């Protein structure tokens, strides 16, 4: 799908301020992302989600993450993720590839 090394760079620049990826990592402003793939929205244990995230009910995978990361507030209206999104498809593909490798 994407380039893991480029995706890691994107994660560090755009995501790491609010998220961790390692097993047992702390929640920050956003939830720890370990185990993200195959998990339903709003399910990271110990993180306080909005009702919008909890009730969205989709399962995170390559396709749902590609859509969400383009415009988080459009995909889940009411999310507290303040990130505007990544418009470039290739950059999102790289990030999703990195997340898949780093969170499982």
UniProtKB/Swiss-Prot annotation:
GO molecular function terms noted in the UniProt entry: electron transfer activity; heme binding; metal ion binding
Post-translational modifications: Binds 1 heme c group covalently per subunit.
Residue positions, PTM N-acetylglycine: 2
GO cellular component: mitochondrial intermembrane space
Localisation: Mitochondrion intermembrane space
Chief subcellular location: mitochondrion
Protein residues bound to heme c: 15, 18-19, 81
UniProt xrefs under Pfam families: Cytochrom_C
Role description: Electron carrier protein. The oxidized form of the cytochrome c heme group can accept an electron from the heme group of the cytochrome c1 subunit of cytochrome reductase. Cytochrome c then transfers this electron to the cytochrome oxidase complex, the final protein carrier in the mitochondrial electron-transport chain.
Family: Belongs to the cytochrome c family.
Protein name: Cytochrome c
Organism of provenance: Katsuwonus pelamis
Lineage: Eukaryota, Metazoa, Chordata, Craniata, Vertebrata
Gene: cyc
């Amino acid at each position: 799908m994407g380039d893991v090394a480029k995706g890691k760079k994107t994660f560090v620049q755009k995501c790491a301020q609010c998220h961790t990826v390692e097993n047992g990592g702390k929640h920050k402003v956003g939830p720890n992302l370990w185990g993200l793939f195959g998990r339903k929205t709003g399910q990271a244990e110990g993180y306080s989600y909005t009702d919008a995230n909890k009730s969205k009910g989709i399962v995170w995978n390559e396709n749902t993450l590609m859509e969400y990361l383009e415009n988080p507030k459009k995909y889940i209206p009411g999310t507290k993720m303040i990130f505007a999104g990544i418009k470039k498809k290739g950059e999102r593909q790289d990030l999703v590839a990195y997340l898949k490798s780093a969170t499982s």
